[in-house]
Amino acid sequence: WKDDIKIDQEAVKAYVGGEFKPNAGAHAGRDWGKFDIEAEVVGLCPTGCMTYESGTLSIDNKNCTRCMHCINTMPRALKIGDERGASILVGAKAPVLDGAQMGSLLIPFIAAEEPFDEVKEVIENIWEWWMEEGKNRERLGETMKRVGFQKLLEVTGTKAVPQHVSEPRHNPYIFFKEEEVPGGWSRDISDYRKRHMR
């Protein structure tokens, strides 16, 4: 989904009050104690985008990575948004010796509605690029590593977003072009450093 997570504050209060079992009752075989929303939901959010203050749960949807932990823990209180679609990952493989390798996120969100023309257009662009750039018996993921992921982003017309970074601050594959940099390559670096002194 693309839009905000829907929150039912009454159901949140019911979870905190013990009326509803967390995880839809999946852990009901044993007494785990009183449900602690701070420890079991807010504290386990990977981006820290949730807060629970004075009986109200709020989510900073801009920073949410949609891991779905909160939704799985409180399914009656939290629901996914209405604008639904798909993410497209490319370049995955499962070789016997190395084990399965996850694909790279290419399209964070695309509307997946019949007749799926938007999805087909992206896939056809990838196929054309792969047929032109790929070597004999070379997989898409190997072509992406050899030519560069940024080239695939350009071919599909996808703008780089933070979700494309798999390892922050570790050899980025997104490089800026001169027209994207304010002042271009010819700006005075000493002037820039004056404005950004530590």
From Swiss-Prot:
The UniProt record lists the keyword Metal-binding: yes
Gene3D superfamilies documented for this protein: Sulfite Reductase Hemoprotein, domain 1
Domain of life where this protein originates: Bacteria
Protein residues bound to [4Fe-4S] cluster: 45, 64, 67, 70
Residue ranges of domain 4Fe-4S ferredoxin-type in the record: 55-83
Single GO molecular function: oxidoreductase activity
Claim: Magnesium is one of the keywords in the record: no
InterPro entries cross-referenced by the UniProt entry: 4Fe4S_Fe-S-bd, NO2/SO3_Rdtase_4Fe4S_dom, NO2/SO3_Rdtase_4Fe4S_sf
Keywords of the record: 4Fe-4S, Iron, Iron-sulfur, Metal-binding
Complex and partners: Heterohexamer of two alpha, two beta and two gamma subunits.
Stated role: Part of the complex that catalyzes the reduction of sulfite to sulfide. The alpha and beta subunits may have arisen by gene duplication. They both bind 2 iron-sulfur clusters, but the alpha subunit seems to be catalytically inactive, due to substitutions along the putative substrate access channel, and because it binds sirohydrochlorin (the dematallated form of siroheme) instead of siroheme.
Name of the protein in its database record: Sulfite reductase, dissimilatory-type subunit alpha
Species of provenance: Megalodesulfovibrio gigas (strain ATCC 19364 / DSM 1382 / NCIMB 9332 / VKM B-1759) (Desulfovibrio gigas)
Annotated gene: dsrA
